């Protein structure tokens, strides 16, 4: 199967996707009523899109093409308002977080959608287990070769993005001991982790053609790498973040990725090579397991450094780009988060340590999403 040409888009424009949990009070388990909610809100949208994800307990909010994080925030805030209003009318709750802490995957109903039903046929129970919730950020690129360079550049910072957004310590009623357990769900999929090595868009087209020979890949949407090019949109899409508990944190993460993309494409600080990825999964694991307390290992020198320290270095590097893009408030907020030493996974554990229950935790997450 041939790959579509890379659609030229304005560099550094962005789009944000948030996979939200649809909750059924008073037990605060996942609901199976996302279709009802989506049908209720679609006529009220003026910008962006609200749509299904894999199962009936998931709802995706997606912005249109945005020039900066302020425009993206306005679109997401408007969608948040209409979703919460409809959820209240249907006696449902909405919240963020990368996993629901006690749902059972066997109860999850795959959406009545041709693509998702085909995916269920290919992957079986793995699809129901993939009832987890992430944030994806698209960044515009001028051409396919820039997209491949940007993908490799951003891959250096996958651990940083994971650690800052980690919000999935609980799963199936247990503390997983991970800051981000969500990404472990995808480890059984054949397209888990980093994209196979290519050095330019022509090589990527060849890779896609070979992947299509498997008959499991019909489009880019069927590839679930940590970062992937999206030729139809003319973007690179970062897919490793847990859905945050607040809209503000989602905007901050998008601002960081946009600023990092600008820094990478204007400064070109790396010369990508295949060896860059030799320790990729080890460093990724450190971020998932320990969050900002993880330790990164340099593939070339063997030097080890705290992920928190390296994240502060990244934030300093991208600050000039953030100022040019109007994203400096996002960088300031994330810098403060790192210096305080926490993420949302840590907050969740503190809630439980203080005597809270998992049911109470989900209730609290719904309150946080409504601004209470």
UniProtKB/Swiss-Prot annotation:
GO terms for molecular function: ATP binding; glutamate-cysteine ligase activity. InterPro entries: GCL_type2/YbdK_subfam, GCS2, Gln_synth/guanido_kin_cat_dom, YbdK. Its EC number is 6.3.2.2. It catalyses: L-cysteine + L-glutamate + ATP = gamma-L-glutamyl-L-cysteine + ADP + phosphate + H(+). It is an enzyme of class 6 (ligase). GO terms for biological process: modified amino acid biosynthetic process. Keywords: ATP-binding, Ligase, Nucleotide-binding. ATP-dependent carboxylate-amine ligase which exhibits weak glutamate--cysteine ligase activity. Homodimer. Belongs to the glutamate--cysteine ligase type 2 family. YbdK subfamily. This is Putative glutamate--cysteine ligase 2. It comes from Salmonella agona (strain SL483). The lineage of its organism: Bacteria, Pseudomonadati, Pseudomonadota, Gammaproteobacteria, Enterobacterales.
């Amino acid at each position: 199967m041939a790959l579509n040409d890379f659609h030229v888009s304005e560099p550094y424009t962005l789009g944000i996707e948030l996979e939200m949990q649809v909750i059924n009070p008073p037990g605060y388990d996942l609901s199976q009523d996302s279709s009802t909610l989506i049908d209720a809100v679609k006529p009220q949208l003026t910008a962006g899109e609200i749509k299904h994800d894999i199962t009936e307990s998931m709802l995706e909010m997606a912005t249109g093409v945005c020039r900066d994080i302020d425009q993206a925030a306005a679109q997401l805030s408007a969608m948040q308002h209409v979703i919460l209003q409809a959820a209240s009318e249907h006696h449902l709750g909405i919240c963020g977080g990368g996993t629901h802490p006690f749902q059972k995957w066997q109860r999850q109903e795959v959406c009545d959608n041709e693509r998702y039903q085909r995916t269920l046929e290919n992957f079986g129970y793995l699809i129901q287990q993939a009832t987890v919730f992430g944030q994806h950020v698209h960044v515009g690129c001028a051409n396919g070769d820039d997209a491949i360079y940007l993908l490799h550049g951003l891959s250096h910072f996958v651990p940083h993005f994971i650690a800052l957004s980690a919000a999935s310590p609980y799963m199936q009623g247990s503390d997983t001991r991970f800051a981000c357990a969500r990404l472990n769900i995808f480890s059984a999929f054949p397209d888990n982790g980093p994209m196979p090595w290519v050095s330019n868009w022509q090589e990527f087209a060849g890779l896609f053609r070979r992947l299509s020979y498997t008959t499991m890949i019909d489009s880019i949407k069927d590839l679930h790498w940590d970062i992937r090019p999206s030729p139809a949109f003319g973007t690179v899409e970062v897919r490793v973040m847990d859905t945050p508990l607040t809209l503000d944190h989602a905007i901050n993460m998008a601002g960081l990725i946009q600023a990092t993309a600008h820094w990478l494409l204007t400064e070109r600080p790396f010369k990508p090579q295949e060896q860059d990825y030799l320790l990729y999964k080890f460093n990724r694991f450190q971020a998932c397991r320990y969050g900002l307390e993880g330790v990164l290992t340099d593939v070339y020198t063997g030097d080890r450094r705290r992920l928190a320290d390296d994240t502060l270095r990244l934030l300093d590097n991208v600050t000039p780009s953030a100022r040019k893009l109007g994203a400096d408030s996002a960088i300031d907020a994330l810098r403060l988060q790192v210096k305080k030493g926490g993420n949302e996974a840590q907050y969740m554990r503190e809630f439980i340590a203080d005597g809270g229950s998992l049911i109470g935790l989900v209730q609290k997450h719904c309150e946080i999403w409504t601004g209470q």
